[in-house]
Amino acid sequence: RAADADVEVVAPEDARAWIDALDGDGPGDGRAGPFDADDSVYCSVDVDALDPAYAPGTGTMEPFGLDPREVRDLVRAVAPHADGFDVVEVNDRDDGQAAALGGKLLREFVFSHADATR
């Protein structure tokens, strides 16, 4: 379905390669990486990709997920190229840990996007 809609889905195990492709030396160096600089990019983070130790508030907890630092680095790397951002699959019936993490990722997106548009 995603391919039909011209959407690139990055599996959790491929996230580190995307960070490296986008930034090379770390978040913020501005290389276009896996997409063209003029592409319209929308970054959607599914909380299910995170390890449940950090984000228990999700409908599908799977062990061996991503570390929050990896997701933060990916958000920072994509933000300068993105037109929008969201965090999905947050369960509101947990202790608020996943929601707090989602809010912090949103903050990282806003700051990184703003720095790139100066």
Where are the language model's segments positioned?
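Active-site-proximal loop->helix
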Residues: 1-5
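Catalytic cores of soluble, metal-dependent hydrolases
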Residues: 8-10, 14-118
